[in-house]
Amino acid sequence: MTKAAELRQKDVAGLEAEIKSLQKAHFGLRMQKATQQLGNTGTLRTTRRDIARAKTILAEKQAAK
């Protein structure tokens, strides 16, 4: 889980890279769930929320400019 304080310290490019990596991880987890290889389905929820958290902070930074 990524904390909001950690994300706020990153610049816009860093946030975009973080979002991209989280989306890749989320896709992999979804594929594991579809093939019934994922044991802990709660990781899907936390990954989805981490993506939303990062996107929110990115939007805040872009609006501040």
Curated annotation (Swiss-Prot):
InterPro entries: Ribosomal_uL29, Ribosomal_uL29_CS, Ribosomal_uL29_sf. CDD domains: Ribosomal_L29_HIP. It comes from the Bacteria. GO terms for biological process: translation. SUPFAM superfamilies: Ribosomal protein L29 (L29p). GO terms for cellular component: ribonucleoprotein complex; ribosome. It holds the Pfam family Ribosomal_L29. PROSITE patterns: RIBOSOMAL_L29. Keywords: Ribonucleoprotein, Ribosomal protein. GO terms for molecular function: structural constituent of ribosome. Belongs to the universal ribosomal protein uL29 family. This is Large ribosomal subunit protein uL29. The gene is rpmC.
